[in-house]
Amino acid sequence: MSTRKVSYFYDNEVGNHYYGPNHPMKPHRMRMTHDLVLNYGIYKKMQIFRPRKASELELTNFHSDDYINFLKLVTPDNMHDYSKQLVKFNVREDCPVFDGMYNFCQISSGGSIGCAVKVNSKESDVAINWAGGLHHAKKSEASGFCYTNDIVLSILELLKHHERVLYIDIDIHHGDGVEEAFYTTDRVMTVSFHKYGDYFPGTGDVKDIGADKGKYYSLNFPLKDGIDDESYQSIFRPIIRSVMDFYRPGAVVIQCGADSLTGDRLGCFNLTLRGHAQCIEFLKSFNVPLVVLGGGGYTIKNVARCWTYETSILVDSELKDELPYNDYLEYYGPEYRLHITPNNMENQNTKDYLEKLKIQLLENLRNLNHAPAAAHHDIPPDSFNYSDDEDDEDPDVRISEADRDKKVHHQGELSDSDEEDGRRNYSNGLEATSTSRRNQVSISAYDKERPSYNSRNNNNNNNNNNNNNNNNNNNSNNNNSHHHNEDADVDMDSG
């Protein structure tokens, strides 16, 4: 039986959001995942929390004020009034305006911040938010289906209590937004295993190693089509083992994008659920506090399979391959099994290619200072303490939550067809981006005391009755909060 304390964040509103017809990103996959988690009985081994929605001030700990204000105001009905801002903030095409877009961002980011709060307070050893992992969003720009970067916000929360945080990305796409945010600091190390070449976002070369104090603290392993379980683990394990030894993080954040699985609508890797989940299992062996987030994944039946299986790994629960009855059983036919089989695609990642890159990256790690220390600073207040507002429901009754979810389906939502419009454009036709200082975050500024999450999150409470909030005494404080100046020079000092 698992001795790890595991927290799991889920909001039943998240699956109601819809990017639009033929768009590959389908938030409905989170509802499917949660339904499998419930019906496999995994939920009994976790504490389940509905996340607090991130406030405007919380989001602007990384994002610019004008960008967040725009996301808050724009809707499909009034978007014609924001034509200049749509271009400025890249909210178009792959990042469309959709109903409830800002609410979706609040849920995703609030869950990932909540994960960090649980880890910081030592109430959890592992915290999960499958609605998070939106790693492409920039400080003032949407990108790659991502509007707010919940990962950066979660890491900033972790940095309140941990000198060093390690970020690992196993999505098929490079974790560019997170890398850019922390490119010049040694307090966050980013490690990304991704498809590289004529493929979105076009960044993540092995030569991209960080800058200034962050030099050698960005590590990229560019991969080719068709990598399988064995090849992936032959690089993941030695690289991560060395990173853990050299860097010695106080906490680890892993983005578990499921588009690196075989058969993904936009992907070109050949990993099975077991191969993907072995990354999680390996990280568990280090017994370091772990935040586990979602990410990409566009064959949604496999996304749900993957994240359910990885949830079971985190709570040490064995699952039968035969899927239990669930509300979305028809999605999983005709096999109705948990595990998937690899296809016969060629693995273009030769042993020589992988070995050469592995040696190069291990050599880069030797340039690191062992476990760099941050300057002493006062610890800012934690974000909202979920212990003050835990759900009093009997956990065994939670399975009925699936029946309480709003069943909002949209035309085309059930399809994983490769023939839908946009497959080619979404997978590798988007314009590549480059690392930019304007997308970085000031860690030294964040070390200074900021308003607590408790005081700045209550604007959302009146609209979130499902959260059973008990903290209504702070509502009068929100309007007095001041945003940071996004035009200030970026300072990435360690302390």
UniProtKB/Swiss-Prot annotation:
**Annotated a divalent metal cation binding sites:** D171, H173, D259
SUPFAM superfamilies xrefs? Arginase/deacetylase (SSF52768)
Please indicate which superkingdom the organism of origin belongs to.
Answer: Eukaryota
| GO CC annotation, single | histone deacetylase complex
InterPro entries in the record, alphabetically?
HDAC_PDAC, His_deacetylse, His_deacetylse_1, His_deacetylse_dom, His_deacetylse_dom_sf, Ureohydrolase_dom_sf
Which residue intervals make up region (Disordered)?
372-495
Enzyme Commission number(s): 3.5.1.98
Q: Where is the composition biased (Basic and acidic residues)?
A: 396-413
Bias type Polar residues, positions? 425-443
What does this protein do, in the record's words?
A: Responsible for the deacetylation of lysine residues on the N-terminal part of the core histones (H2A, H2B, H3 and H4). Histone deacetylation plays an important role in transcriptional regulation, cell cycle progression and developmental events. Histone deacetylases act via the formation of large multiprotein complexes.
Give the protein name, as stated in the record.
Type-1 histone deacetylase 1
Q: Which organism is it from?
A: Dictyostelium discoideum (Social amoeba)
**Gene from which this protein is expressed:** hdaA
